[in-house]
């Protein structure tokens, strides 16, 4: 074969099977560069096959529910139960039956760049998205578990059309007679995973803005969780207006600074 490596690379990018005549022809080319291209092409196909299989697996609950006649299946998830500061945020997402974007998974398993890309895709393709944001004051009043349920219900109530079936990550919500709570649902249901991405990106962006308002706690990086820098901030600065006073390290910092007055 007399074609350059660059030309072969471009042609292989259009090939989808080892049975393709051009791929077969390349296998006879002994140049190391060509053999490396064949190897990388096979790896690309393997990755694509895994993503396609993962998509089918992630849609199995939705596929079954669509077959049962449900039309508007909402996935619900939350983020921010554990942080010492900021709100708890829930999202509810209704995806179309033909939604086929690969790479949707539990937001915690995706890097920030990937989450941001998928956030935009989900916003563009979803039938409806609802978001519930419950701030630190309510969390302190009712506890984080109840605040999370309020956030989820708020997100669901924002959906239009209203869902006729609800898939929830872990927490039984009793929002509808037609609902299913799934342990680690954000790794099992594409609707819940999509909701986890919407909730995560929404809250992260809020915390990045809070970092500008309340510097010294590293909110832009820890998102309000009790990291070393955050705890150091509590020790040296004290609490800020978005801290959860019912959470132990915050409560201790507040008492400490009050004792110094």
UniProtKB/Swiss-Prot annotation:
- Do you know which Pfam families this protein is assigned to? RNase_HII
Entry keyword annotation includes Ribonucleoprotein: no
Q: Localized where?
A: Cytoplasm
User: What is any one of the record's Gene Ontology cellular component terms?
Assistant: cytoplasm
Q: Which reaction does it catalyse?
A: Endonucleolytic cleavage to 5'-phosphomonoester
Q: Where is the RNase H type-2 domain?
A: 71-259
> What keywords were assigned to this record?
Cytoplasm, Endonuclease, Hydrolase, Manganese, Metal-binding, Nuclease
- Please tell me whether the keyword Ribosomal protein is annotated for this protein: no
* Gene Ontology biological-process annotations: DNA replication, removal of RNA primer; mismatch repair
Q: What is its EC number?
A: 3.1.26.4
Which molecular-function annotations from GO does this UniProt entry contain?
A: manganese ion binding; RNA binding; RNA-DNA hybrid ribonuclease activity
Paste the cofactor note: Manganese or magnesium. Binds 1 divalent metal ion per monomer in the absence of substrate. May bind a second metal ion after substrate binding.
Listed binding positions for a divalent metal cation are 77-78, 169
Q: Which cofactor does it need?
A: Mn(2+); Mg(2+)
Top-level lineage group: Bacteria
Chief place where the protein resides: cytoplasm
Q: What does this protein do?
A: Endonuclease that specifically degrades the RNA of RNA-DNA hybrids.
Give the family per the record: Belongs to the RNase HII family.
Q: What is this protein called?
A: Ribonuclease HII
Q: Which organism is it from?
A: Listeria innocua serovar 6a (strain ATCC BAA-680 / CLIP 11262)
Q: Which gene encodes it?
A: rnhB
């Amino acid at each position: 074969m007399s074609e350059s490596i660059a030309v072969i690379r471009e042609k292989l990018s259009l090939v989808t099977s080892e049975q393709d005549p051009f791929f077969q022809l390349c296998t006879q080319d002994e140049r190391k560069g060509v053999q490396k291209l064949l190897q990388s092409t096979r790896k690309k196909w393997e990755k694509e096959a895994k993503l396609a299989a993962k998509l089918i697996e992630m849609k199995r609950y939705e596929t079954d529910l669509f077959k049962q006649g449900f039309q508007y299946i909402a996935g619900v998830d939350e983020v921010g139960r554990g942080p010492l500061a900021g709100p708890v945020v829930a999202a509810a997402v209704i995806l179309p039956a033909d939604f086929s974007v690969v790479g949707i998974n539990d937001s915690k398993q995706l890097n920030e760049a990937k989450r941001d890309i998928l956030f935009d895709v989900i916003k563009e393709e979803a039938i409806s998205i609802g978001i519930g944001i419950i701030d630190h004051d309510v969390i302190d009043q009712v506890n984080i578990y109840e605040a999370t349920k309020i956030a989820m219900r708020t997100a669901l109530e924002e959906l239009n059309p209203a869902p006729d079936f609800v898939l929830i990550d872990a927490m039984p919500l009793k929002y509808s007679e037609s609902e299913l709570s799934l342990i680690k649902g954000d790794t099992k249901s594409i609707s819940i995973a999509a909701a986890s991405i919407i909730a995560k990106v929404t809250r992260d962006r809020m915390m990045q803005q809070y970092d500008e308002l309340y510097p010294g706690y590293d909110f832009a990086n820890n998102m309000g969780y009790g990291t070393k820098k955050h705890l150091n901030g509590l020790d040296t600065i004290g609490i800020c207006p978005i801290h959860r006073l019912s959470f132990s390290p915050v409560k201790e910092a507040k008492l400490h600074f009050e004792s110094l007055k």
